[in-house]
Amino acid sequence: MTMTSTTTKAMAMAAAVLAAAAVAATNAQTCGKQNDGMICPHNLCCSQFGYCGLGRDYCGTGCQSGACCSSQRCGSQGGGATCSNNQCCSQYGYCGFGSEYCGSGCQNGPCRADIKCGSNANGELCPNNMCCSQWGYCGLGSEFCGNGCQSGACCPEKRCGKQAGGDKCPNNFCCSAGGYCGLGGNYCGSGCQSGGCYKGGDGMAAILANNQSVSFEGIIESVAELV
C-alpha cells in the first residue's frame, strides 16, 4: 500500500469517525424540550436552548432544569409540579436542595439532612456540582447558590483568571475568556483560561458528559495510529 493510499484511508476513517462523534456530541449535550425532556448529569443546567452547562449562560434566563439561578416552582404552589433533577420542593413551593428545601414542610423529593462543606468542613467540595453556602452546607437554590456561595454552581458565577488576579475556579470548573467560572462550551471553549478547558477550544467540538470533555483531536490521532 502506498503512502498516498494510506493517508487517504486515514483521512476517510477520521472523517467518518468525526461525523459519528458530531452526532454523539449533539445528543450528549442537548437536553430539555429540545431532546425529549432529557436531564443533564450532575445537576448541570439545561439552558433555554437545550444545552448542558453551568454559569449564567446556562443557569440564567430560560433555564429548564438543574442548578438554575432562579428556583423553579413546585408543589401546591406550582400546580402540583415536581422538581427536576430529584430536587426537593420546599413548603413554600420552590425547588432546591438542603434543609431549607428538604427539611420541615418539604412537599416532595428526597428530603434529607444537610451535607457540610467549605469553611464548615475543611474546604470539602459538595458532590454533583451542588453549591456550598456561605454557612458551609451543600444545597441548590438561592439559599445556597446566592450571596456568599463558596463553590459549586454559584449564581452569579465566581470571577477568575486575569480578571481576578489569576484566581482559579473551584470544582475544576472552566474559567472563561471573560473571567467567569462555569461549564460548557461558553466557558470551556475558545479563550478558556484554566480548569477543564476543551483541548480543541478554538472552534473544535467536544462532548460534555459526566463533567469531562473529549475532543476530536484525540479521535484523529487514534485513527492515524490504526492505519
UniProtKB/Swiss-Prot annotation:
Residue ranges of domain Chitin-binding type-1 in the record: 29-70, 71-113, 114-156, 157-199
Record keywords: Disulfide bond included?
Answer: yes
Q: According to the UniProt record, list the residues that bear Pyrrolidone carboxylic acid.
A: 29
Record-annotated residues binding substrate?
A: 38-40, 90-101, 142-143
Q: Which residues constitute the signal peptide according to the record?
A: 1-28
Q: Which organism is it from?
A: Oryza sativa subsp. indica
What are the disulphide bonds in this sequence? 31-46, 40-52, 45-59, 63-68, 74-89, 83-95, 88-102, 106-111, 117-132, 126-138, 131-145, 149-154, 160-175, 169-181, 174-188, 192-197
Instruction: Specify the propeptide location in this chain.
Output: 202-227
Q: Which GO terms describe its molecular function?
A: carbohydrate binding; chitin binding
Q: Please explain the role this protein plays, according to its UniProt record.
A: N-acetyl-D-glucosamine binding lectin.
Return the PROSITE patterns for the record.
CHIT_BIND_I_1 (PS00026), CHIT_BIND_I_2 (PS50941)
CDD domains found in the cross-reference section: ChtBD1 (cd00035)
Its recorded name reads Lectin
